């Protein structure tokens, strides 16, 4: 009977899928591309081409639907096996017995139609695919003559007879918000004078132009200037003499920031511009980030930009693009099925953005046209020939010399419109430079423009002036539907500016602050969401103590400090020591102030009678359970003081948009503890020792861990009191390689001289074996009972003995990584408990811990890995964690870009070791036809795969010398640094490896996406400080901010309160930012237990929030700059895969 029922279920499922597949093909067969925003791709010409395209498309659909049927068949079989096996509890650990845990959800959660996107992505050919470009380039670096990294450029004198060369000389000043000086010091010494002189000198002549990028500096100057000067700036913007480019808070790094922070600093800058200047930037300007990410191109496109410019790209790629005239291209996302993400990008062709490298290929000549370097000044030309002031006597010869460079540079492009930037770091701070540059160039312009035989039109311009002229020229010569510019997909990492000098060191430099940055992002997002919803309650109940609080001002300051840290010399770890301290102090202060906002907002939301709300300006009612004592110290758990008489209240916030089963761990002062759920029932608790050091157990603190089930964006209240409880269980310990006895106290601690037999821990999904050093050796996935080699080891990289060595920017190793060697077997501590088990290995420079949670669901399916790294006593070394497996990834691996998308990588033997290191923001993985091994990260670091089956992650680097890129120091201010990871091993199904090798795109699984989100957005436990003020103060037992979980593939990026148009307060609107993630379905699905489903990107917003009415919802551009002309109030949103969409939302508490 049971077997018959299983076949009925299976047969019904197959029947439904076949019928659905036929419907899907009929519905879509006449289309070449999916509906929605990606219909813009170019269509084939001619009837035969169209017919062939349709046949190919139907073949793809048949293959995709066969794949769906295969996946569902596997799922039904797995489901029937689960029924056959009966319910499975946790096997627990031998010493602990068993424990009843939540059963997994049904495994089949993804709508089969949502699986089509990943299989189609990358099917559209590009003109330029960066993975292919790497195959084409020899990377041989021959001497190119005056253009050392290029080639000799020639032209014919009559090439401009029919169309003159149009040159835009673009004055600019690159102002780092911190590098060799702090942000404030640079402003005091340089930047304020640049602005002041800009106003004076641009007003002198309407033909003069200037560009500005960093809004952090502009906002600081705006606060101290008078109204006439403000009006002058507005006038300059209005008449086109001044242009704001990009308009973010900073010019961010593009390798290490998460897309959350990239968007946030863009919004902060654009909101400031809208409020104070009423301008909307059109063009992106990124001349100094050390490599470029397509994520930034996508964000600019969705913010409403038409064009962008980049500079720091590998010199061999610049040469290749110059030879093929592909320096200007439409940058298209790898995953785009059409052309909806195209943005016109200009790549500067030469070594640097300074004046010697921007007029043409010969820096010796171009330097002579940087008039700040005239004899008698502080700067000269390193090529030995100084500039000459322009006079009637030399203007002809000097103009000819400069025009020759312009013409040669123009030969690298496809039009006769040329961009010639004129600037450098902190330029135009003195009025004398304005005079020298402007007056000398004005004489050159005047002469050139007055000589028809020169066939040139030259003027000062801005970046948009250039792009406008470029588009006009292209429109004039466009004769067919084919674009003048190629479509390009891929990224521009890893950057090298010369020789084998790859800038892969900064992916890891100062990792302490990279981790602090990610914590800050999670906290600011939590604060934004809680504050917006608490604000609506406060407005409804007229709670003036909340409404009049400085929370919005504090939140704005935190946004700006986070934005400042995305600067390309901040999060990168490439600033002077004291500048790093300044950044760290800003983050630290904002973390503290965010805790107050989170605590006060959560307290109001969880309070039953809102009118009883009180606020102490000096502290929050609800306090975080961790405290960081200084900007460079690790966060520590506070110890909650318990008593038997009065319970302590613990409020746990789930900042994630799905309901969640996760472990909460807190510290208390008593081992006899009872935790009561919101229903008043005791919950299962693991009481673990708090270790003062390797062998000493604290008598003052105990760790209490329990499983909490919290609704999406939900707050839940637990009561904790000192009491004997049958639901409380002590953890057991085994100490290996222990040469001294540990004090047991109340815990059972077993001492072993050495490990002897293998050390093992397990949970319902995984069993792990460790060697006698406490390092992982192999893993068994209980889903299929197969054992997999999975070895963890640590390595050292040194630095080369050549003249140029590793520094803050560069990674220049002395060869392959060398194994970390301990003189004797390290001390190993094994914890086994009801809620979790772990193995901790104590090496001299790393405390390495692998933990398994004994829970069903998402967090039970991966291994948590934490490393406390301390290399403060080493010299010129970099420490790496390597994970080795038998996966045959064939030199192909994958790293994410900005936590947004996955970029395939290849380990290339023709490149040096350091070139094969890439940025990893949230994950890296390797795979073969059967398995995928993913390392998920809670901080940005460098990652690589130096051999088949391996993933390496760089954890810290200590370098004693400068690497000659301007910093003037090494990196030796190392901190004790906590790195946090998860390792996920997944079984793949229905994989075509040949197709996969050709694909320029890849996607995480849904399980991987959610594991990453859990890692980066942990539960936030908060303790009620003291007791409730009076019996009238009652807390709700639970308050879900959402009515139900969002679809599995939709992430609520932020709910950001929008500023008021007047004053410094808030408006009644918020920015709702949603991201629909692309995911891969080719994984065995048994037991995943996702707490959500997918819905083809459709979501009703009217039913989104719990007890908050949506009064209006209007689509907007990403950074709130633009609203569609036909924007209307919406009740349902429909998101395409991979898209990030912003809406203006107005909420009201009901």
UniProtKB/Swiss-Prot annotation:
Topological domains annotated Cytoplasmic: 1-5
Primary localisation category: Golgi
Catalytic reaction(s) noted: N(4)-{beta-D-GlcNAc-(1->2)-alpha-D-Man-(1->3)-[alpha-D-Man-(1->3)-[alpha-D-Man-(1->6)]-alpha-D-Man-(1->6)]-beta-D-Man-(1->4)-beta-D-GlcNAc-(1->4)-beta-D-GlcNAc}-L-asparaginyl-[protein] + 2 H2O = 2 alpha-D-mannopyranose + an N(4)-{beta-D-GlcNAc-(1->2)-alpha-D-Man-(1->3)-[alpha-D-Man-(1->6)]-beta-D-Man-(1->4)-beta-D-GlcNAc-(1->4)-beta-D-GlcNAc}-L-asparaginyl-[protein]
Residues bearing the modification Phosphoserine: 80, 82
Binding site for Zn(2+): 174, 176, 288, 568
Subcellular localization, as worded in the UniProt entry: Golgi apparatus membrane
Name of this chain's protein: Alpha-mannosidase 2
Gene responsible for this protein: Man2a1
């Amino acid at each position: 009977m049971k077997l018959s029922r299983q076949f009925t279920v299976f047969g019904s499922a197959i029947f439904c899928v076949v019928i659905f597949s036929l419907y899907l093909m009929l519905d879509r067969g006449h289309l070449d591309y999916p509906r929605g925003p990606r219909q813009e791709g170019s269509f084939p010409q001619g009837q035969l081409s169209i017919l062939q395209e349709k046949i190919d498309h139907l073949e793809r659909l048949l293959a995709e639907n066969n794949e769906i049927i295969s996946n569902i068949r596997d799922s039904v079989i797995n489901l029937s096996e689960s029924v056959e096996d009966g319910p499975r509890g946790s096997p627990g650990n031998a010493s602990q017995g068993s424990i009843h845990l939540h059963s997994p959800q049904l495994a089949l959660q993804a709508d089969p139609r949502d699986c089509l996107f990943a299989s189609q992505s990358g099917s559209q050919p590009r003109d330029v695919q960066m993975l292919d470009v790497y195959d084409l380039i020899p990377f041989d670096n021959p001497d190119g003559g005056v253009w050392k990294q290029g080639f000799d450029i020639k032209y014919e004198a009559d090439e401009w007879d029919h169309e003159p060369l149009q040159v835009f000389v673009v004055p600019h000043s690159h102002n780092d918000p911190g590098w060799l000086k702090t942000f404030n010091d640079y402003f005091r010494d340089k930047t304020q004078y640049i602005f002041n002189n800009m106003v004076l000198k641009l007003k002198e002549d309407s033909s003069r132009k200037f560009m500005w990028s960093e809004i952090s500096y502009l906002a600081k100057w705006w606060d101290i200037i008078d109204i006439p000067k403000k009006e002058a700036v507005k006038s300059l913007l209005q008449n086109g003499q001044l242009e704001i480019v990009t308009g973010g808070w900073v010019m961010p790094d593009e390798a290490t920031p998460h897309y959350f922070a990239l968007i946030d600093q863009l919004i902060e800058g654009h909101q400031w511009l809208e409020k104070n200047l009423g301008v909307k930037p059109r063009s992106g300007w990124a001349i100094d980030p050390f490599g470029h990410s397509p994520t930034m191109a996508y964000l600019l496109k969705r913010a409403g930009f038409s064009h962008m410019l980049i500079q720091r790209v590998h010199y061999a790629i610049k040469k290749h693009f110059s030879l093929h005239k592909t320096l200007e291209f439409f940058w298209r996302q790898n995953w785009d099925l059409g052309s909806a993400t195209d943005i016109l990008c200009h790549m500067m062709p030469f070594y640097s953005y300074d004046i010697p490298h921007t007029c043409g290929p010969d820096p010796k000549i171009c330097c002579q046209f940087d008039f700040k370097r005239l004899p008698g000044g502080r700067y000269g030309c390193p090529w030995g020939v100084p500039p000459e002031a322009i006079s009637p006597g030399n203007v002809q010869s000097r103009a000819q010399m400069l025009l020759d460079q312009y013409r040669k540079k123009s030969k690298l492009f496809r039009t006769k419109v040329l961009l010639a930037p004129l600037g450098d770091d902190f330029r135009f701070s003195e009025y004398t430079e304005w005079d020298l540059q402007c007056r000398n160039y004005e004489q050159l312009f005047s002469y050139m423009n007055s000589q028809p035989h020169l066939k040139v039109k030259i003027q000062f311009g801005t970046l948009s002036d250039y792009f406008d002229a470029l588009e006009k020229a292209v429109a004039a010569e466009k004769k067919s539907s084919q674009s003048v510019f190629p479509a390009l997909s891929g990224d521009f990492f890893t950057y090298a500016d010369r020789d084998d000098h790859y800038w892969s060191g900064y992916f890891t430099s100062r990792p302490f602050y990279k981790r602090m940055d990610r914590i800050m992002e999670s906290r600011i997002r939590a604060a934004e969401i809680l504050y917006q919803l608490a604000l609506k309650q406060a407005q409804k109940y007229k709670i003036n103590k909340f409404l009049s609080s400085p929370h919005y001002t504090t939140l704005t300051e935190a946004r700006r400090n986070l934005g400042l840290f995305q600067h390309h010399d901040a999060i990168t770890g490439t600033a002077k020591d004291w500048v790093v301290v300044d950044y760290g102090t800003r983050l630290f202060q904002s973390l503290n102030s965010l805790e107050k906002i989170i605590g006060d907002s959560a307290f109001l939301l969880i309070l039953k009678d809102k009118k009883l709300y009180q606020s102490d300006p000096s502290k929050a009612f609800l306090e975080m359970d961790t405290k960081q004592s200084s900007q460079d110290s690790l966060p520590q758990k506070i110890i909650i003081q318990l008593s038997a008489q009065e319970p302590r209240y613990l409020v746990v916030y789930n900042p994630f948009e799905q309901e969640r089963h996760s472990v909460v761990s807190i510290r208390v002062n008593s081992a006899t503890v009872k935790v009561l759920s919101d229903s008043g029932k005791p919950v299962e608790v693991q009481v673990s020792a708090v270790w003062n050091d390797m062998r000493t157990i604290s008598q003052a603190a105990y760790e209490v861990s329990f499983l909490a089930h919290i609704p999406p964006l939900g707050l839940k209240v637990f009561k904790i009191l000192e009491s004997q409880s049958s639901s409380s269980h002590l953890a057991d310990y085994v100490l290996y390689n222990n040469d001294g006895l540990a004090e047991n106290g109340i815990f059972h601690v077993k001492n072993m001289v050495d490990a002897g037999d293998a050390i093992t821990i397990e949970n319902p999904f995984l069993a792990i074996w460790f060697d006698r050093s406490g390092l992982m050796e192999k893993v068994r996935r209980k889903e299929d009972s197969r054992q997999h080699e999975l070895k963890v080891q640590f390595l050292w990289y040194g630095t080369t003995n050549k003249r140029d060595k590793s520094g803050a920017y560069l990674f220049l190793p002395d060869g392959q990584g060398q194994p970390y060697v301990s003189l004797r077997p390290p001390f190993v501590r094994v914890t086994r408990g009801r809620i979790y088990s772990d193995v901790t290995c104590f090496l001299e420079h790393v405390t390495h811990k692998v933990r398994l949670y004994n829970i069903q669901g998402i967090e039970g399916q991966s291994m948590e890995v934490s490393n406390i790294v301390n290399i403060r006593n080493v010299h010129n070394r970099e420490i790496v964690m390597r994970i080795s497996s038998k996966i045959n990834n064939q030199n192909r691996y994958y790293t994410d870009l900005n936590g947004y998308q996955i970029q395939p990588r290849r380990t290339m033997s023709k490149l040096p070791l350091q070139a094969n290191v890439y940025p990893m923001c949230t994950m890296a993985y390797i795979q073969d036809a059967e398995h995928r091994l993913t390392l998920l990260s809670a901080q940005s670091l460098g990652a690589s795969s130096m051999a088949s089956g391996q993933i390496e992650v760089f954890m810290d680097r200590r370098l004693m010398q400068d690497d000659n890129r301007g910093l003037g120091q090494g990196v030796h201010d190392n901190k004790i640094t906590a790195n946090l990871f998860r390792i996920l091993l997944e079984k793949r199904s229905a994989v075509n490896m040949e197709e996969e090798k050709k694909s320029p795109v890849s996607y995480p699984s849904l399980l991987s996406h959610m594991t990453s989100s859990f890692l980066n957005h942990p539960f936030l436990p908060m303790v009620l400080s003291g007791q409730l003020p009076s019996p009238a103060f009652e807390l709700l037992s639970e308050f879900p901010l959402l009515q139900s979980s969002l679809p599995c593939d939709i992430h609520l990026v932020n709910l950001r309160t929008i500023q008021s148009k007047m004053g410094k307060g808030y408006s009644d609107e918020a920015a709702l930012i949603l991201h629909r993630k692309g995911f891969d379905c080719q994984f065995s699905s048994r037991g995943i237990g996702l707490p959500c489903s997918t819905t083809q990107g459709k979501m009703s917003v009217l039913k989104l929030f719990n007890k908050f009415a949506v009064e209006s919802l209007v689509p907007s551009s990403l950074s709130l700059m633009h609203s569609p002309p036909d924007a209307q109030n919406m009740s349902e949103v429909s998101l395409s895969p991979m898209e990030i969409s912003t809406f203006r939302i107005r909420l009201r508490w009901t």
